[in-house]
Amino acid sequence: MIVKICGLKKAVDVAAAVDNGADMIGFVFAKSKRQVTVEKAHELAKNIPANVKKVGVFVNPTEEELKAAIKGVPLDIVQLHGQEPAKQANRTDAEVIKAFPVKDGKLPTNINDYPNAYILLDAPAEEYEGGSGKTFDWDKINRDMLTKNKLIIAGGLNAQNVQEAIKRFEPYAVDISSGVETNGEKDPEKIKCFIKTAKGVE
């Protein structure tokens, strides 16, 4: 199972994720309590091996902002969490994750407008996009409704429920941020436990 640890701001947290087998490291460039600058992400990325993908999280960025981060960090993947047009997701300089909030158990009608992107399902937004620590209603989503083989599940995951999420959705990857935090800070033990649990699902 591919595991993405998101919202990292400190070298010690990046090390905890990488050392315990994370496959993707997420840096948040959108307005958030986990926001980092391109310069900060560049410094943190120096300690990330080439086999671990670096992901930048954005909400309605300009094309200039995307290009600056892709080159400056550098990023392997951009994660779009706003109302970005499909053309912004069709790019050759980075892979793309397009995030969709699942509201009232319904999938967005435009989910198929992004054929080349990973599709990330998340809980509805609160003050900021993503990172709310809440799950969407899993019971109302039928895995058969999702034709993507690049499905990523996010929203309220933790070491206690990630196995159920994986068995239910059979996703390409799982994505976590607040679920590996204690008092708003990344917790190395929670990171270790989550990755071990997620990768233990057969």
Swiss-Prot record:
<keyword id="KW-0028">Amino-acid biosynthesis</keyword>
<dbReference type="Pfam" id="PF00697">
    <property type="entry name" value="PRAI"/>
</dbReference>
<keyword id="KW-0057">Aromatic amino acid biosynthesis</keyword>
<keyword id="KW-0822">Tryptophan biosynthesis</keyword>
<dbReference type="InterPro" id="IPR001240">
    <property type="entry name" value="PRAI_dom"/>
</dbReference>
<comment type="similarity">
    <text>Belongs to the TrpF family.</text>
</comment>
<dbReference type="InterPro" id="IPR013785">
    <property type="entry name" value="Aldolase_TIM"/>
</dbReference>
<keyword id="KW-0413">Isomerase</keyword>
<dbReference type="GO" id="GO:0000162">
    <property type="term" value="P:L-tryptophan biosynthetic process"/>
</dbReference>
<dbReference type="InterPro" id="IPR044643">
    <property type="entry name" value="TrpF_fam"/>
</dbReference>
<protein>
    <recommendedName>
        <fullName>N-(5'-phosphoribosyl)anthranilate isomerase</fullName>
        <ecNumber>5.3.1.24</ecNumber>
    </recommendedName>
</protein>
<dbReference type="GO" id="GO:0004640">
    <property type="term" value="F:phosphoribosylanthranilate isomerase activity"/>
</dbReference>
<dbReference type="InterPro" id="IPR011060">
    <property type="entry name" value="RibuloseP-bd_barrel"/>
</dbReference>
<comment type="pathway">
    <text>Amino-acid biosynthesis; L-tryptophan biosynthesis; L-tryptophan from chorismate: step 3/5.</text>
</comment>
